């Protein structure tokens, strides 16, 4: 032991003395330098320093020599501790804080009479505790790279290897290099599978001694090393030191290839594999390799289905903690990553990095086959499948394969089965959550993808990508039949259906077929009444987004479509086109048969079919023929009852756009058709024609049956049905037939209960506008129809006609039983006596009546309202009979007296 000498501040102990208990020592390890129960704690040795007897250093050293010899001989006889275990402890000491390094390099030995405390090593053998020096020793050896100080030069030499990156020990199995032989020995156990260090608590085995020590702390549950920055606790001071670098930003381990720095050596080691291409960790299921064990561990969860990290907000589970943390930011609304160009925020840093490429225009990932470049590697990987023909995403139902996972997701929705992801707004279900998330943007109105050229927004990136081609002029999808090019694959696919004559998308409600799936989806909403596009201003809903877009202009006041003739502006292009027809313009295409002129040649061609008698378009339901496809399409809606044109003001629906156009003029007040005789204006051309017939000499078409004259031949043809008894318009509910479609429409409201015309004075509703017009005269007192016999006036023309029959003694309405009546309505009521029909039913008790007035009286028995005196006068064979209801007095006049 002559080589042991007194250590002063100016000299360094020899390596043998300095590294007692470490791998470099020639002596066997006397005791565990960091007892497992106190690893990383504020060491008990520190507290013992104050209580130590303050002997001269020389005296203590002499006493310690004998203790060391005794301890060494005991250690040799009781334990055979492997040198690599000690070496490992030595390596670990490089990462310990200075005070723990001091403890590890102290001379061994302490008087048992002073403390008497003993510590067990890993094998259970007890040795005396180490004695710490009383006076602190200055750290004179400083690293000129990072400024860290050491007491001994040998420590500094070992530390410098971190900066130089020198690794002299190479693994002959995988080529991995290490700074020390002990690290290489531990590494080789990865290849051999040897795990010599076993936990006596649970039996779990480890390759290295330090790993076992780390593991043992899980049983004790102690975390005695606390970070004074954030309060986080750790089992070991070395781990705490590494953690502190997060706060300080210190990254002492730098890559010699690219200069990237890391907080710890393991991070650098894994990073270097990027340059070397080394991936030593292989999945035993699919053969995929990884540069680090954690990557393999996470990957294996794909095969096992394990998702240990669950969100406590929504229950969604993830395979990594980081993915869970990223997901949680959705619930918190956190978007901490902000673009300094456009200030757009993102949940994840990776998304921000991808986004920034939009501003730089950088596309670093280039295809070596065709030269196409991409912003990210994933885009290139997917693109390469076009060249390789690889289709890794296979449908487990039908076996069809796809290049993209999104393609498979869309395809799977074709197969029937439960769709687990349901929209809470409208109840629509989806096979995948990603599709549900895309769908939800319909309800939220969220459009996060903005075109940097025109500012137009989109719900998804794919929509934006296709839209950008409008600005660039790129049309990558070309038809191989006619050469026409398109900006999207779906547009090309739809176009090809024209050549094939295909309309593959068939409505399951009315069997109507469409070229496009999108057109079918929109059409189906007519049947389902679904209106997913809601206005956030007034709550009004629409079947499609374009309808909502036009509607929103009502709130914003925007009118982008302006007439260049008069300057009038409109909210939609169709409104402008309709308006333009008011202005006289050039019509260069003239019909040589009737000299009628048209704006377009196509319109002229269609018109000529009228003269030729051609009606090539035939209805497959009723075989009626038409000149134009548009007329056939409109006609078909009679059979399907489809009314796709809806008014955005009052929600009234129409079979064709022209009817909607005319209807809208009620709301706008526009009356473009003016009478050249009296100046009165109307909303439709047909109304003007009808009006003109009131002027003398303006009715050239006369009925040869009754002499009644009409302005148009069409009106005359309709009128003649009265004489011929034709009633082509039949009600499907009750079978009743009518001469005019307008009468059928009014009649249908009896079955539907619809009364769209409401009096603004008393709230009474009517089935038709004429009923409302007559009713309003009750409030105004207006009676424009006066009898020229007796001067009595009436509010309606029909009432006057009925009254005149009293003077003439006529009762033109005869029943088969011989009774006659002045009024058709009275005859209809009378006939119900013979048929037994009682169409008026009480919704309280179900009792039925043959006339409405009886139902009205009956209802008062439920409401408790007092009965009114109602008089009904009917004539039988020229004799007038008076009936008094509820004991009321009979009134003259041949009409009912009703309270106002």
From Swiss-Prot:
Primary site of residence: nucleus
Bias kind Acidic residues: ranges: 9-18
Disulfide partners: none
Stretches the record annotates as Disordered: 1-97
Transmembrane parts of this sequence: none
Single Gene Ontology BP annotation: regulation of transcription by RNA polymerase II
Annotated Basic and acidic residues bias: 47-73, 83-94
GO cellular component: nucleus
Keyword check for Nucleus: yes
UniProtKB keywords: Isopeptide bond, Metal-binding, Nucleus, Repeat, Transcription, Transcription regulation, Ubl conjugation, Zinc, Zinc-finger
Subcellular location: Nucleus
Cross-link (Glycyl lysine isopeptide (Lys-Gly) (interchain with G-Cter in SUMO2)): 5, 48, 62, 65, 82, 92, 587, 748, 882
Alphabetical list of Gene3D superfamilies matching this protein: Classic Zinc Finger
PROSITE patterns: ZINC_FINGER_C2H2_1, ZINC_FINGER_C2H2_2
Function: May play a role in differentiating skeletal muscle.
The protein's name in its UniProt record: Zinc finger protein 62 homolog
Organism listed in the record: Homo sapiens (Human)
